[in-house]
Curated annotation (Swiss-Prot):
InterPro entries in UniProt: D1/D2, Photo_II_D1/D2_sf, Photo_RC_L/M, Photo_RC_L/M_CS, PSII_D1
Entry's Gene Ontology BP terms: photosynthetic electron transport in photosystem II; response to herbicide
Catalysed reaction equations from the record: 2 a plastoquinone + 4 hnu + 2 H2O = 2 a plastoquinol + O2
Keywords on record: Acetylation, Calcium, Chlorophyll, Chromophore, Electron transport, Herbicide resistance, Iron, Magnesium, Manganese, Membrane, Metal-binding, Oxidoreductase, Phosphoprotein, Photosynthesis, Photosystem II, Plastid, Transmembrane, Transmembrane helix, Transport
Protein name (database record): Photosystem II protein D1
Length: 353
């Protein structure tokens, strides 16, 4: 016993730090990924809050026409946003020390790069921390795998898309209306609604919502009665109990008769794998779609695909969508371009006289 106490006392400060960092007895697990996650997410969050409240207007298009995004410069919670870094900066790494002054850094949208790069590093470390805690507890690694879907989606819109388009100014603004503006412009320039990977993402999100509601309602409807009519059904469950809290056979029988037998899972493990995999795979595909459209491999183009015997175009919904795309493209960045590329003439029209 004496030897053990002496060994503990002689343990280095670094050793005690390592044990504390990797201990699963802490109220919140830190882990080695947490060592990087905590400062990066704190930095991103702090700068976001300060910039959302007080950042001056940013010259997003690089044409000396600053755009206001903060609350103190006339915005509200819905219209406010962290304006992306200026097109004049492009993809250059733009920390504070690269600018001539803090005023110049703010004018060129430096906070956007700072927030986005710290945020992406932070959420990637959060994913690693999920794996690390699972590993230390002897669990399987699928929690981190599932979280990789939103990490991939965030990386696609904040990093891959700006790289493909050549400027951080094309990244998604950090705000409510800025997100909607990004979506509208993305549709105008890339026809994302006609991209099969986006369709898979929609199926993943809507399907995941449907399956979650179906599963929750089936379980809630087939609980094993443990309470009286005067008590909440929730009182019939005790945390950690070994007995099943609902009758999976009853749920399986109900759903099998409602649809057909093989539409219902008879294995709880495969059911829950399916519930996790469906939305995750869908969002993976959407992130992959954004990453390919970043390099202008766009959605399907079926414009003017149907013509009559005289060669006249019979409009389809694809043509209606195309007309909407052109309208949206005309309206965005209206001071930076005379015409969007789709509407610009290849050659100047001939004139008489």
């Amino acid at each position: 016993m004496t030897a053990i106490l002496e060994r503990r006392e002689s343990e280095s400060l670094w050793g005690r730090f390592c044990n504390w960092i990797t201990s699963t007895e802490n109220r919140l697990y830190i882990g080695w990924f947490g060592v990087l996650m905590i400062p990066t997410l704190l930095t991103a969050t702090s700068v976001f809050i300060i910039a959302f409240i007080a950042a001056p207007p940013v010259d997003i298009d690089g044409i000396r026409e600053p755009v206001s995004g903060s609350l103190l410069y006339g915005n509200n919670i819905v219209s406010g946003a962290i304006i992306p870094t200026s097109a004049a900066i492009g993809l250059h790494f733009y920390p504070i020390w690269e600018a001539a002054s803090v005023d110049e850094w703010l004018y060129n949208g430096g906070p956007y790069e700072l927030i986005v790069l710290h945020f992406l590093l932070g959420v990637a470390c959060y994913m690693g921390r999920e794996w690390e805690l699972s590993f230390r507890l002897g669990m399987r690694p699928w929690i981190a795998v599932a979280y990789s879907a939103p990490v991939a989606a965030a990386t696609a819109v904040f990093l891959i898309y700006p790289i493909g388009q050549g400027s951080f100014s094309d990244g998604m603004p950090l705000g409510i209306s800025g997100t909607f503006n990004f979506m509208i412009v993305f549709q105008a320039e890339h026809n994302i609604l006609m991209h099969p990977f986006h369709m898979l993402g929609v199926a993943g999100v809507f399907g995941g919502s449907l399956f979650s509601a179906m599963h929750g309602s089936l379980v809630t409807s087939s609980l094993i009665r443990e309470t009286t009519e005067n008590e909440s059904a929730n009182e019939g469950y005790r945390f950690g109990q070994e007995e099943e809290t609902y009758n999976i056979v009853a749920a399986h029988g109900y759903f099998g008769r409602l649809i057909f037998q093989y539409a219902s899972f008879n294995n709880s493990r495969s059911l829950h794998f399916f519930l996790a995999a469906w939305p995750v795979v869908g969002i993976w595909f959407t992130a992959l779609g954004i990453s390919t459209m970043a390099f202008n491999l766009n959605g399907f183009n079926f414009n003017q695909s149907v013509v009559d015997s005289q060669g006249r175009v019979i409009n389809t919904w694809a043509d209606i969508i195309n007309r909407a795309n052109l309208g949206m493209e005309v309206m965005h960045e209206r001071n930076a371009h005379n015409f969007p590329l789709d509407l610009a003439a290849i050659e100047a029209p001939a004139t008489n006289g």
